[in-house]
Amino acid sequence: MVYLQTVNEFFTQSKSLTEAYPKTTKLSIKYRTNEQSQNYLIAKAFESASGICLKYRTDKAAELGRLLLIANKLSYVSTGNEIPPEPEQEVVASPVTEQKKAEPSAPPKGSKKKKRGKKK
């Protein structure tokens, strides 16, 4: 059992494992909570015939999305299909128009404080 340090390293190692054994490689993602409020996520790629087990553990919630993308990509590899390229986001250009300068409006009435004279 090997714990890998980064998500990218886990992806490359599990991808090569899935390419070598596409029918028998399994991927699991578990979320654990402890009483001491230590929450963590474990991703595991396991191939039973050879006994190869790759693990990645993190306590960062932002990496959950990355791990789900990895699971999606590995499903393509296990079925023998190519991983589709990520769609590029289209940037729609809008013409720049000049904005009119805002004319200062009259100050609201009653907002001035009355001046008081000196007390004797």
Curated annotation (Swiss-Prot):
Protein name stated in the entry: Uncharacterized protein C17H9.07
One GO MF term: 7S RNA binding
Biased composition (Basic residues): 110-120
Transmembrane segments: none
Record's GO cellular component terms: cytosol; nucleolus; nucleus; signal recognition particle, endoplasmic reticulum targeting
A Pfam family it matches: SRP9-21
Organism: Schizosaccharomyces pombe (strain 972 / ATCC 24843) (Fission yeast)
GO biological process: SRP-dependent cotranslational protein targeting to membrane
Region: Disordered, residue numbers: 79-120
